[in-house]
Amino acid sequence: MSFRCLLVALAVVAAPSVAVAESYEVVGDSIGVGIDWAAKVPSHARNSVAICNGWVLQQLLEPPRGATVFMSLGTNDAVGGALNVKQQVDKIVSTAAAQELRLVWIGPPCVLKPWNENVKKLDAILREQLQGKGVTYVTMSDPSLCDRSLRAGDGVHFNMAGYTRMWQRAAAAAGVPIVLAAKTASEPVVHHIRKTASKKSYKNRHVAHIAATTKGSSPN
């Protein structure tokens, strides 16, 4: 090895490592759309996504490998009483693992509806099934989220304060640092975020979310 090559090699070894910014993204149903309003990260969430219909599998192919993915999923299954989800859950977990994603599963939240009992049952099923699977499961079925001051008029979705509460809980469970704006607690910002979502896409998601809330066919 020449003296010049040796110097180059030593310089590479001695160079300090550069920290790579971690990527955070949101997938899942329209509750996930709302959570993204608070998180302000790239989102692939959309209306009517459920465990049983498998649409989230395509969403999980979108984030970059190694990203931390916050996935809101289960509400559209609870509304119809679809509780036999073991096979679909295993497929979701394996898809995330194949993409080397760190999956943070945000469970179905408490709802102001008669089918809230299904929410509780599905939440328990998911917590049990995901144990030891390398997934961070964040329960949202507790009564504190049924506070009407946090909810939209349909009793299923949330207002900005509610989505912020959910995001704060999910971020804390995942160990993701958030900073609350000084003037309001409704706009948390994640450090080192790979922001790719445009204002236009944000507006389109907002319109679609509101339309789904008013139609009342599928909760999200």
Language-model segment annotations:
Residues S72, I106-G107:
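Alpha/beta-hydrolase-fold catalytic nucleophile elbow
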Residues E22-K91, L112-K120:
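Conserved SGNH/GDSL esterase-like catalytic core that processes O-acyl groups on lipids
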Residues C5-P16:
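Bacterial N-terminal signal peptides
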Residues V111-N220:
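Catalytic His-Asp segment of secreted/periplasmic serine-dependent ester chemistry enzymes
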Residues V93-A97:
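Surface-exposed amphipathic alpha-helices with a cationic face
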Residues S17-A21:
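Sec/Tat signal peptide C-region and signal peptidase I cleavage site
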Residues M1-S2:
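N-terminal secretory signal peptides that target proteins for export/translocation
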Residues A98-R102:
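A short helix->loop->beta-strand "cap" motif at the edges of active sites that frequently abuts
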